[in-house]
Amino acid sequence: MQLTRVSAVSVLMAILSGLSMGCSGKKKQNLDFSRGLEGWTHRDPRWRVEATSGRSGSEAAVWKGENGKFAEQLKRSFAVEAGGIYRVGVWAKTVDFTQHGVATKPVLCCGYSDRNGKYLGSFWANEVIDNISCTDGWRYFEGTTPPLPSGATTLSVSLTFRDGASGTVLFDDLSIERLGCEPIAYVTSSRYRDEGFDGTVDFHALLQINLVKYPLETLRPVFRYTDASGKESEVSPTVLKPNEASVTLRVADLAKGRQDVRLVVRTADGKTVAEAACPFTRLSNMPQSHVRFDGHGRTWVGGKKFFPLGFYSPGDWDPKRWAPYYAQLTNGIINCLLPYREVSVETIRQFDAAGVKTIYSLREWLWGTRCCKRDYRTREASLAKIREIVNELKDEPGIVAWYVMDEAPLSQISFLAELKEMLHQIDPDRPVYAVTDKPYDIRQFAATFDVVGMDPYPVGNHGGAKIDIASKWPIQAAEATWHSRPMWQVPQTFNWWWERKTEVNPEHRFPRRDELANMCYQAIAAGANGLVAFDLAGTTRKDKDGTTGFVRTREIYQELKSRIDLFLSNPGPAVSTMPEGTVVRTWRRDDGTVSALVVNTTRSDVSGALVCKGHEQKKIDLPALGYAVIDLKAKGN
């Protein structure tokens, strides 16, 4: 989503004038439309203010018409501060409001930018669940920003709707509230569960310091820790950027046991600007947890290497519907399922006995999400129920991870961080798994999960031409997490038309066999250490041509399974040159053989040279969407 930019001049003038409409210094500001559209901008003359149409008979902003456009938004800008957390809310009401003939909802979206108008991020507000049963037609939409990044000065609020909307929509009583300020969002480590017994460990901090008040060159940050002799030590970051401070330490140089490795940021004259810590534990030997990750991001289950290869699936099974597929799911090709809904212990054990592990979804009890069950829609009730579930199931060997994030908004960060800490305390044997479709948000969320997945679904999504996001997104995620989080990617095994029946798009279809194989191999070449496709039900539904994708998906998974030994090998040599339009990953097998997976990320033929450190150049020719596993010859052999 690309929001309309605010000009640098207008932002600067607003700041200098005190910005009567701003909230950088105010705790909360409420705005109605009693002064018409003063202070608001729009590009559609159909926006107006109607007296007595608002809540309690007040004024309301109204749009009425046909075939509206998202870009024809009613927009207003507010001054904000870097590091601040802001909650935005508005009341909305619709009358005969549809999109392509189907009832739809209005949209509240917000973007934040720097003083030059550079876009820094955005979020969409959600309808507050408690208002679904309202009787007067007014519903409340609310969203919360993350701690705003360094350089953020402006928050732009847009009241709008999706393209193709028709009917009437009304808005009233906008509120902007500053909740707090977090100059350091978090400090995290590169080690699973923030513990280790050998090698090195990286500590990374996400900075959100107001660099207008505290220019980077005036700051003196240090990481503080207790060393192996018991003395307090400190070291300057090896990497210091406007939004990041990082350092690498030897685990052996840390005191044994648990301690806080703390980042303290001071000014040159000694004033403390901010501090935050990562609890880290130096162990005496390798942890013996049921599920763990090694330094290469590979999963180990019960002491054996494990490459997740599975699907999102229904919860408990309808025997009549799934009987024809059960044998195909338990014949050794797939090894895990992620039931999207509550699943019984009996089902978990049934699949475990057949060699299929369960990634247990907690999404139905996650506070602040639309899928949360009604009885658990407070933060306290949500955490209490999840604690109960995990305590009940944590001894089940068939469970390999807890699924806690399903394309969550940034407003969920504090809850997910608390949830991860709770899960680590209750169950030391399993990781926390998160999936998102927002690569630009990954760094904000990085401290809330142990293993991450991106779910790019390019086929039929906005034309389906740019299939390369199947590798670009995981590459972005790896960079955003400092290459410190394992990755279980989510390939597309469904037809977008099933989700968007209001759209007329001839590209809506189930992925062809070559597309599906390409997306899977792209993900692996980009660094994925597992695949959990969305979704199994999608492979069994009939497409427009009357076929299903189950057979082609099963064939591709069988091919992938035949190469799992390669995918679980140690990393190979660095790639210095690759053909344009490709993504490449190398491995070194136990016998010393080096192999490379080369994937064409385009819908055109590609060719060029592949050069890996210490190995002879290889000529590559791949057809559109093609891929190949090739052996590399060491120089001098």
For the regions a protein language model found, what residue spans apply to each?
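Bacterial N-terminal signal peptides that target proteins for export
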Residues: 1-11
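Bacterial N-terminal signal peptides
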Residues: 10-18
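Extracellular and organelle-lumenal recognition/adhesion modules and their flexible linkers in secreted
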Residues: 23-248
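A short tyrosine-centered beta-strand micro-motif
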Residues: 86, 245, 257-263
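Internal, hydrophobic beta-strand segments that form the core of beta-sheet-rich folds
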Residues: 158-160, 259-266
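Glycan-processing catalytic domains of CAZymes
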Residues: 197-199, 204-211, 263-266, 272-635
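Surface-exposed, short loops/turns at beta-strand junctions within beta-sandwich domains
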Residues: 251-257
